Amino acid sequence: MATMHDKITLQLPAKPEYVSLGRLSLSGIASRAGFSYEAIEDLKIAVSEAITNSVKHAFKGEDDGEITVEYLIYEDKLEVRVSDNGTSFDLETRKQEIGPYEVGEDAEMMRIGGLGLFLIETLMDDVKLYYDEGVSVVMTKYINEKQVEENAKSIST
């Protein structure tokens, strides 16, 4: 089991204007952890989608919601937890309602909903959803060891 080195927690109001704060924090944390530029871009998209989902769906535009974003830094991975205490949902039921996306499907004709979670699952190495008082999305991205070595060599002390 990997040892956690650091844990950083953000408490964000459930408002669209704070999505960028979660994304920018992640960018700095992932860079410091040794992720490549491409991996950081994937992480930023996934975290933005998770926070946006909480803003849009958990609180339905109400101003009193709060989203917790936790960044857990391990020696070989970064785990990001986006949690809210808003309205929960059942993922499997939602997937059945919207149906599968087909390769080559016209983007103009796609059903609304589910695409954010699809993106998150595509961009991250592991994604888990937990339903308790709201929804928690736990996303994991592993650090490429070669990239960590290259970054370490380029840092001067």
Swiss-Prot record:
It holds the Pfam family HATPase_c_2. GO terms for molecular function: ATP binding; protein serine kinase activity; protein serine/threonine kinase activity; sigma factor antagonist activity. This is Serine-protein kinase RsbW. It is an enzyme of class 2 (transferase). InterPro entries: Anti-sigma-factor_SerPK, HATPase_C_sf, RsbW. The lineage of its organism: Bacteria, Bacillati, Bacillota, Bacilli, Bacillales. Its EC number is 2.7.11.1. Negative regulator of sigma-B activity. Phosphorylates and inactivates its specific antagonist protein, RsbV. Upon phosphorylation of RsbV, RsbW is released and binds to sigma-B, thereby blocking its ability to form an RNA polymerase holoenzyme (E-sigma-B). It comes from Listeria monocytogenes serotype 4a (strain HCC23). Belongs to the anti-sigma-factor family.
